[in-house]
Every structure is written in structure tokens, then in C-alpha cells.
Amino acid sequence: GNIWVIIPDQGIFRYKDNELYFYEISNRRQFKQESPNCICVRENGEVWIGFWGLGICRYNPQNDSFEQIVEDRDGRPLVGKNINSICEYGDWLIMAANEGELIKYNTKSHVLEDIKVAGADNTFYTTVAYMKGKIWLGTFNGLYVIDEKKNEVVSLKEDLMRSFSLSDKMIYSMCQDSEGGIWIGTLFGGVNYLPNRNLQFDKFVPGSSGNSLNTKRIRELAEDVKGNIWIGTEDAGISV
């Protein structure tokens, strides 16, 4: 299979069979305004890239290139949006933009629609995932769990008076494990774990134990085939 790597100031890389392939989507001089920023590999194998400033791109394996989508079928633009995160949602792709926009794009009908998030106005959207039949949105003002079918939004925030609340309001990453638990990475509060039974978080932060985290600044979370959770940090490497 392919290993995909996004380096915002350089471009998109694909590694396969000891060969490294490079895809330069935008002008190098514009990398600060037009840069690849996130990736979604759908269940059918399609690879989609979300950009700052350039909309979204889909990988075409037939000619080994990316096809840019700058607007929907009605002319609503994607160009100019800063897309921080992208995930699969049935026939849709959900995108979290740092302007405080949560939008979805239908890959079949090519329609773009807004997803309203009550209480999440005027905040920075960092990451989005579709887990347990709901949309999970990480922001710089907590976590929002959205049920579109029921038109319901649950807001989860840091609360110093509640020991089982989030440890930090700034959410950077999310991951669902094979047991249905959800891991939340924060900017200043380490890792939060939400078991598959309630909305009370367990917390993992730096401590005196040799098996504890080395930092509270969490960037990425992922589970491997053995069930191990890999934790990428901002300033202390990787923990497992």
C-alpha cells in the first residue's frame, strides 16, 4: 500500500515499494497562504487532501495526479478557506475550517452544505471526526458532539470544578480505538480518554512515573493493529 505524508511548507509525498513520489500542488512562493494541511483516506481507498487557500484535491491513481475542486456544482467556493481537518461521513466529506466553519461536501452530487454548531461561534476549529454515528468537532473552546439526525449538539469543556471534565479546552486531535473508546489530544492538558460508556474523561498527563507522558502538548493520536495508542507530541517526540 501507499504511505502518504503531508508537509505544509513543501507539498504531498507518497511512499511505496521503496520509492518516494512528490506532488507539488501550489506555487512554492505561496506556501504560507496555499498549503496542503490534512488528509482523508476513505473506506473505498480514495485519497482527499484539504488545503489552506486551495480547497480540496482528490488523488487520481490512473494518471498519478491530484484533481483540484475549487467550488461545488452551484458555484459556492472552496478556494480561500483554511481547512484544518477532513473526514469521511458516508457519501460526504466533512471539513473543519479555522474561520469557524464546519462544512460538508457530497462526493457524488458535488454539493456543499453548512453544518450548524450551536454555541461554537467565533472559535478556531481544529479537528473533526465521525465516530459512533456522530460528528466530533475539536475547537479552541472545547469539544462538540453533533447528532445531525436529531439536530442535537453536546458541548464538552474544561471545568476545574469537575474532575472528570476535559483537562484543557484547546483540542488538537481525536482517535477512536478498537474497543470504542475515544482519545482526545489537547494543546496544554495532555491526553483525555473517554471510555465506551459515559461522558467522563480519564486523563493522562506528565508525572513522576517512567511510564507517564513527557509533555502536555499533544499533536496526533493513532492506534496500531495491536491496539497500541501512538501519541505524537509538539515538543517531546512520540509516546506509546
Regions found by a protein language model. Give the residues of each.
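Carboxylate-rich, polar loop motifs that coordinate divalent cations or form catalytic acidic clusters
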Residues: 1-240
